[in-house]
């Protein structure tokens, strides 16, 4: 089976509406199967996380507890809102707020991450996880293709 690689793309056009005052956004896209909904795409993206992603998320949760961060929910991030073409996930924490948007348009599924930090700790946290974030976001989206 040929693996479809997620490619970087322009972040979601309505990022400001999703998370007003955001300071960071990035996005990846893959071809979307015909007839798929955004919720189905989101489930595919989050369903088959390889061991290395599960390990990194578990490590993040363990280290995060030491500094008072909210652990990532075992069942996935809460859905903020959904439509057939868009699902917004995420939550607010003391160091930063984030949203993940899975959107369908033009035959592609796009995963955009949007972040607004509250303090220096939030900015530093984002900088520290950035290399892992990019690899994880791209790999998860590849599960849709």
What are these regions (language model features)?
Residues 115-135:
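A short acidic/glycine-rich loop-to-helix N-cap element
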Residues 69-106:
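Hydrophobic-ligand binding "helix-grip"
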Residues 2, 121-127, 142-145:
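Terminal "cap-and-tail" regions of soluble proteins that handle hydrophobic small molecules
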Residues 35, 94-96, 115-116:
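Short, solvent-exposed loop/turn segments at secondary-structure junctions
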Residues 103-120:
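Short acidic, glycine/tyrosine-flanked loop/strand segments centered on an H-E-D-like triad
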Residues 1-66:
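Hydrophobic ligand-binding cavity/cleft-lining segments
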Residues 23-29, 86, 108-110:
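Intrinsic-disorder/low-complexity, polar/charged segments enriched in Ser/Thr/Lys/Arg/Asp/Glu/Gln
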Residues 134-142:
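Amphipathic, Lys/Arg-enriched alpha-helical patches that create a basic surface
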């Amino acid at each position: 089976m040929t693996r479809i690689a997620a490619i970087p793309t322009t972040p979601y056009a309505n990022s400001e509406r999703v998370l007003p005052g955001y300071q960071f956004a990035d996005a990846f896209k893959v071809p979307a199967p015909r007839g798929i909904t955004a919720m189905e795409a989101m489930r595919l993206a989050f369903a088959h996380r390889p061991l290395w992603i599960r390990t990194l998320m578990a490590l993040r949760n363990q280290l995060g507890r030491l500094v008072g961060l909210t652990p990532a929910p075992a069942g996935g991030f809460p859905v903020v809102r959904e439509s057939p073409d868009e699902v917004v996930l995420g939550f607010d924490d003391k160091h930063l707020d984030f949203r993940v948007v899975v959107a369908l348009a033009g035959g592609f599924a796009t995963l955009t991450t949007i972040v607004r930090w509250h303090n220096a700790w939030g900015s530093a946290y984002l900088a520290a996880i950035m290399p892992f974030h990019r690899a994880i976001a791209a790999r998860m989206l590849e599960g849709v293709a």
